[in-house]
């Protein structure tokens, strides 16, 4: 019968049992058309107490039954998910289905609250083969309700003569769970089936334990809703075939056994049957483990006192309910805002107990968290759209107001905490830093200026080619084409002669104020004077002790034939090749000391201040900030993008051995290309001048017969390409990589290949695919032009003309053709980035097609008569 009716009638019906110690058992489950949750309890009691199906008038109630034999009080819950309740909600005329279900769920929460504070055991029947997590979540809400109202419950229980739990309940109930179905095959033999039952029960027992702990339903203290037995298993699999019992057979077996022992009278007086059913034994073992502590009389008083839990008296008054509803709506909106914030910041959902207070502000620690990533404007809009779509989906009331708040808070958060710099590097990648003041920003102090960072690196070679360093992607043309090559670690380049290009210098500047330019050296005349100075100092070299590496070079040059023109390059460092002479050293000045003591930041700050100064003087149109172009004739650049340097004498290169101490060349690819140039001069005049040139040359240590039938000279040239990984290679006249096989005669092979085409007159690509095969593939760019000049009365000039796709005009040095001295090894370093009137060229990291062109004829050789005086 209903719990209220049972409480009213129990004192008169069970008058003789009022002092009996009992246990209170709560039953929770679902009714199905073919099986009710009370069926298994009927088997336990061996009588049909609980109906198979609940009527429509008995939904969302508690049925009570006291078993005098077992001394157990059963409280069976008819819940929301019973078929009768679902049918009742569907057929309700006064309320729609959802309103009726919401009311039923509220009533079920009261019923569960009542059971968990008044029972010793809670038996949960699960009709499926898995644990219902939705029901576990519902129990968590019940536990929250119990915690909120425990003081009120404790006050009501003060008048009951029993030592109740201080938390406002009889005790912390033990939970048992029985599964009505399982996935074990019916055709399995009995022994195997029993073994599978035991394994499955054990696994489900562990799962239930973990789930209850996860939802904070078990544990120590007053926060636990229930507890689990530490020594006994709490999960049982019901075997439908063994639920039904043959009561007559059981009684007959008992009477026969006792009759044989002569105790028939005792059997008649105490005819309690022992159970041979697995589920019944399961319940009996668990119930016996706990002592009966409360009498039936006190239990009735307790249940009567707790009826206010069932009738809703615990709930707040309508006025409080209205305020709670408003608070609930605000909390829901706050949760929606929190979820929108999580979608915007791409955070993971917080675990239980860690939910944010509803705000959108990001703390400083969170900005340091890699998961809270700064983002560009495009990424900001994508994340913002995800957040607004979520709000539009879940919010019905005040949607426009909530959307406006989300938009404002997302924009504020992006502007203050998440906005990326988005400045584009010279290679086309954005800066990954949070928006920051950079060099030249006049709105902030100089100390706050910081450099950009694209979080990408590449490998580049110094001007002379002897050393490579890893560099960050440049964000300015000066950083790309100039600053990196002034790195203090490039010691190999410091002692070499370097041509000083003409640079812009306003009238108010002094020579030493410009870090990278000496005005007196910015002309071809200065280069010729330097060459004459080299000739004068070379006389002193004959009387000085040369390094072993140079002595080998001179010896090898004497032993080599003129036809082969084998000029050897030294394996020693540039300092060794120049020891005892300052022929190629740049003149020491206050500028050199200044450069060596300044960092990259100091140079960037200095340049930014110089630009600011010129901007104030309104001279921004007087100079060139890019690479010299035919469209910008008449303007001098602020910094050089080309470098012309001399490694030393031409006999530093030996064609049979190739380049040495030049990193990252492929094996067989370190050889220059011989180029024979025929001269337009009378043969007799040529022979006369050549003899005079060699006779007057103080560096000549021997003479050889001239056997040429026509005037000609041989140069060694190399057009070097380099990719972002630092791979380097030369190309032939077709622009294909020049790599010689192993064990091949390079002298003969190179002559044969050179005869196939004139590399000096060939148009070569500015960019082409690199030889590296490791993905991702890279493109290599023409970076250096190597020229080894002959020892002959000729004038050699170099004047590169470069065409860039999509750019107007032709790029070059911006000066007259650069004259190269005889018997020298020169390297012309080309720009890394091309920027001009048409913009900056960003070709991308890889393109299978060739791009850009270096026009042929950049190196010219003409006859130069020998003058009576020394040249």
Curated annotation (Swiss-Prot):
Residues 573-583 have a biased composition (Low complexity). InterPro entries: SMG8-like (IPR019354). It comes from the Eukaryota. Keywords: Nonsense-mediated mRNA decay. Involved in nonsense-mediated decay (NMD) of mRNAs containing premature stop codons. Probable component of kinase complex containing smg-1 and recruited to stalled ribosomes. PANTHER family: AMPLIFIED IN BREAST CANCER 2-RELATED, NONSENSE-MEDIATED MRNA DECAY FACTOR SMG8. This is Nonsense-mediated mRNA decay factor SMG8. The gene is smg-8.
């Amino acid at each position: 019968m209903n719990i209220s009716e049972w409480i009213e009638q129990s004192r008169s019906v069970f008058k003789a049992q009022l002092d009996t110690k009992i246990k209170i058992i709560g039953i929770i489950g679902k009714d199905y058309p073919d099986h009710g949750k009370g069926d298994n309890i009927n088997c336990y009691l061996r009588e049909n107490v609980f109906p198979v199906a609940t009527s429509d008038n008995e939904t969302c109630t508690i049925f009570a039954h006291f078993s005098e034999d077992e001394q157990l009080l059963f409280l069976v819950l008819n819940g929301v998910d019973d078929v009768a309740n679902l049918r009742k909600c569907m057929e309700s005329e006064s309320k729609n289905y959802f309103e009726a279900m919401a009311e039923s769920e509220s009533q079920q929460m009261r019923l569960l609250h009542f059971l968990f504070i008044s029972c010793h055991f809670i038996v949960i029947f699960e009709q499926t083969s898995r644990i219902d997590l939705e029901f576990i979540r519902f129990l968590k809400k019940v536990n929250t309700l119990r915690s909120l109202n425990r003081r009120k419950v404790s006050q009501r229980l003060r008048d009951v003569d029993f030592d109740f739990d201080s938390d406002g309940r009889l005790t912390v109930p033990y939970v048992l769970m029985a599964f009505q179905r399982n996935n074990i095959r019916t055709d399995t033999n009995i022994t195997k089936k029993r073994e599978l039952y035991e394994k499955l029960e054990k696994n489900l027992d562990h799962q239930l334990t973990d789930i209850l702990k996860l939802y904070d339903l078990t544990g120590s203290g007053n926060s636990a809703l229930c507890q689990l037995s530490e020594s006994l298993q709490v999960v049982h699999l019901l075997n439908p075939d063994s639920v039904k019992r043959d009561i007559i057979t059981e009684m007959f077996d008992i009477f026969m056994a006792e009759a044989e022992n002569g105790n028939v009278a005792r059997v008649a007086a105490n005819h309690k049957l022992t159970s041979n059913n697995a589920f019944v034994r399961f319940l009996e073992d668990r119930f016996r483990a706990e002592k009966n502590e409360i009498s039936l009389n006190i239990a009735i008083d307790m249940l009567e006192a707790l009826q206010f839990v069932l009738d809703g008296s615990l709930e707040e008054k309508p006025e409080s309910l209205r305020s709670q509803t408003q608070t609930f709506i605000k909390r829901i909106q706050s949760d929606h805002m929190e979820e929108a914030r999580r979608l915007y910041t791409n955070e993971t959902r917080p675990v239980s107990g860690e939910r944010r207070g509803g705000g959108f502000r990001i703390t400083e620690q969170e900005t340091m968290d890699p998961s809270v990533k700064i983002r560009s404007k495009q990424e900001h809009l994508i994340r913002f759209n995800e957040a607004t779509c979520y709000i539009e989906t879940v919010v019905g009331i005040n949607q426009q107001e909530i959307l406006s708040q989300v938009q404002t808070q997302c924009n504020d958060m992006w502007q203050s905490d998440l906005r990326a710099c988005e400045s584009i590097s010279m290679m086309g990648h954005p800066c990954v830093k949070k928006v920051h003041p950079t060099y030249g920003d006049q709105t902030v102090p100089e100390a706050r200026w910081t450099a950009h960072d694209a979080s990408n690196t590449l490998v580049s070679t110094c001007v002379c080619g002897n050393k490579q360093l890893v560099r960050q992607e440049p964000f300015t043309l000066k950083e790309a084409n100039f600053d990196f090559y002034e790195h203090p670690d490039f010691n190999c380049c410091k002692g070499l002669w370097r041509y000083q290009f003409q640079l812009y210098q306003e009238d108010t500047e002094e020579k030493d104020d410009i870090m990278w330019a000496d005005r007196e050296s910015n002309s071809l005349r200065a280069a010729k004077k330097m060459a004459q100075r080299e000739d004068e100092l070379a006389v002193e070299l004959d009387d000085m002790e040369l390094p072993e590496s140079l002595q080998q070079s001179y010896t090898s040059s004497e032993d080599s034939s003129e036809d082969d023109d084998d000029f050897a390059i030294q394996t020693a460092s540039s300092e060794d090749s120049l020891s005892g002479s300052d022929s190629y050293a740049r003149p020491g000045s206050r500028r050199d000391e200044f450069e060596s003591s300044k960092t990259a930041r100091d140079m960037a700050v200095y340049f930014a201040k110089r630009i600011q100064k010129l901007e104030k003087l309104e001279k921004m149109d007087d100079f060139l900030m890019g690479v010299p172009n035919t469209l910008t004739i008449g303007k001098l650049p602020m910094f050089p993008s080309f470098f012309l340097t001399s490694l030393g004498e031409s006999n530093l290169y030996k064609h049979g051995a190739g380049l040495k101490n030049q990193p990252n060349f492929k094996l067989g690819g370190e050889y220059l290309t011989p180029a024979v140039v025929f001269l337009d001069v009378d043969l007799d005049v040529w022979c006369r001048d050549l003899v005079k040139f060699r006779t007057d040359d103080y560096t000549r240590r021997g003479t050889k017969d001239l056997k040429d039938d026509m005037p000609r000279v041989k140069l060694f040239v190399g057009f070097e390409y380099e990719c972002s990984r630092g791979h380097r290679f030369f190309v032939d006249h077709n622009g294909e990589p020049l790599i010689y096989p192993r064990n091949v005669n390079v002298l003969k092979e190179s002559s044969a290949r050179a005869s196939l085409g004139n590399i000096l007159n060939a148009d070569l690509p500015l960019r082409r695919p690199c030889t590296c095969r490791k993905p991702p593939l890279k493109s290599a760019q023409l970076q250096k032009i190597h020229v080894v000049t002959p020892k002959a009365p000729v004038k050699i000039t170099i004047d590169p003309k470069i065409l860039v796709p999509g750019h107007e005009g032709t790029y070059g040095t911006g000066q007259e053709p650069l004259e190269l001295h005889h018997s020298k090894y020169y390297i012309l370093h080309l720009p890394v980035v091309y920027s001009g009137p048409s913009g900056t060229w960003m070709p991308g990291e890889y393109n299978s097609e060739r791009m850009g062109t270096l026009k042929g004829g950049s190196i010219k050789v003409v006859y130069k008569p020998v003058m009576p005086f020394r040249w």
